[in-house]
Amino acid sequence: MTGILAVQGAFAEHAAMLDHLGAPWKLLRAAEDFDDSIDRVILPGGESTTQGKLLRSTGLFEPIAEHIAAGKPVFGTCAGMILLARKLDNDDNVYFGALDAVVRRNAYGRQLGSFAATADFGSSSGDSAVVVAPGEHVPQDAPADIVLKDFPLVFIRGPFVAEVGPAATVETSVDGNVVGLRQGKILATAFHPELTDDTRIHELFLSL
C-alpha cells in the first residue's frame, strides 16, 4: 500500500491518480498512520519548509526516513524532491538527505514559476530500452532502461537540480535544467505528474 504524506500540499491529487490505477493508498497525517501495510511512500508538492516542520511535529519524519534507508520505494514531486535531496544550494535545511543531488528551491523565480512543457522521461543505456508512448502503460516488471515518450511536465514554482551526484540518474531535463531523477527505488521530479491525465510515471513508481 502507498502511504501519501498528507500534512500539507497536493496529496489529494496523488490519491486520485492512484485511485484511477486501482492502487490502494493511505494518507499519512500522524506517526500512527505509518503501519506495516505501507510499502511505498509519496512525498507530494507543496511548501517544503512547512512540510519539513510538520514531518517533525507529527512524528512522521523518523518512520519515513527509516523506510527510505531500507531501500523501499519513495516518490517525491516538487517539494518532495527538495525533502529528498542531499543538499539545497540556496537553503541550509536538509531533510531526508537520501537523493544524491543538490537541488535549488524556487529555481525558476516568480516570472517562470508556473509553466508546462513536454519531454521524454527515462534513461537508456542502449537499444534495449522499453519505450512507452502516450496512452500506453508501463509494464509491472518495468526494467531500469525505460523511456516514457512525450510526458507532459507541469511546473508550479518548481525546483531544479543544480548538481547530480554519481548515485543518481538523470531521467529528464528541460532547457538544460535537470528536473527528474532516479536513484534505486527513489523517484523524484521537479514537476507535478499528478496534475496531468498521464498515469505513466505513477505506474513506473508502482513497478519499483
Curated annotation (Swiss-Prot):
Pathway of action: Cofactor biosynthesis; pyridoxal 5'-phosphate biosynthesis
Catalytic site: 78 (nucleophile), 192 (charge relay system), 194 (charge relay system)
Amino acids binding L-glutamine: 46-48, 105, 156-157
Catalytic activity annotation: aldehydo-D-ribose 5-phosphate + D-glyceraldehyde 3-phosphate + L-glutamine = pyridoxal 5'-phosphate + L-glutamate + phosphate + 3 H2O + H(+); L-glutamine + H2O = L-glutamate + NH4(+)
GO molecular function, one term: glutaminase activity
One GO process term, biological-process aspect: pyridoxine metabolic process
InterPro entries assigned: Class_I_gatase-like, PdxT/SNO, PdxT/SNO_CS
PROSITE patterns: PDXT_SNO_1 (PS01236), PDXT_SNO_2 (PS51130)
Keywords: Glutamine amidotransferase, Hydrolase, Lyase, Pyridoxal phosphate
One GO cellular component, as annotated: cytosol
EC number: 4.3.3.6, 3.5.1.2
PANTHER family with a match to the protein in the record: PYRIDOXAL 5'-PHOSPHATE SYNTHASE SUBUNIT SNO (PTHR31559), PYRIDOXAL 5'-PHOSPHATE SYNTHASE SUBUNIT SNO1-RELATED (PTHR31559:SF0)
Family membership: Belongs to the glutaminase PdxT/SNO family.
Quaternary structure, from the entry: In the presence of PdxS, forms a dodecamer of heterodimers. Only shows activity in the heterodimer.
Entry function: Catalyzes the hydrolysis of glutamine to glutamate and ammonia as part of the biosynthesis of pyridoxal 5'-phosphate. The resulting ammonia molecule is channeled to the active site of PdxS.
Protein name: Pyridoxal 5'-phosphate synthase subunit PdxT
Organism in which the protein naturally occurs: Bifidobacterium adolescentis (strain ATCC 15703 / DSM 20083 / NCTC 11814 / E194a)
Source taxonomy: Bacteria, Bacillati, Actinomycetota, Actinomycetes, Bifidobacteriales
